[in-house]
Amino acid sequence: MEFNMYDEKKLLGVIGLCRGAGKAIVGVPMICEHLRNTHEKRGEVKDVIVIEASDTSENTHKKINDKCAYYGVEIVRIAAGCEELGHALGKSAVAAVAIADKGFFAAVKKQLSC
């Protein structure tokens, strides 16, 4: 899926708001832990979307894709790189972020469908 810069900026803005509200899980290890814990507690993982940077390593890409496939979680690879995604989250570089809130999930899906 490709984005023009305007859509990408809006998407990164929504992701930044998620982080500010404490509804974003940042980094591959934290995402994997969240998916595992949520699955153990509820038996299913709902209203979670994982956003992966375009320049993640092959190993990271495989790891996050395998986890998302196992738990049935949607994953989207965006045009922004690790540095840009990290900047939107107030960090240096981030390979992936998960949105785990129903409202923000809907907002991110809306930006992805533009």
Regions found by a protein language model. Give the residues of each.
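N-terminal first-folded block
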Residues: 7-52
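Solvent-exposed alpha-helical segments within well-ordered globular domains of core cellular machineries
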Residues: 13, 33, 62-66, 87, ...
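Short, glycine/charged-enriched secondary-structure capping and boundary segments
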Residues: 40, 64-67, 91-92
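Feature captures the catalytic cores and cofactor-binding loops of soluble hydro-lyases/lyases
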Residues: 45-46, 56-86
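Conserved residues at beta->alpha junctions
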Residues: 54-55, 99
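Short basic, glycine-rich beta-strand/loop surfaces that mediate nucleic-acid
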Residues: 72-114
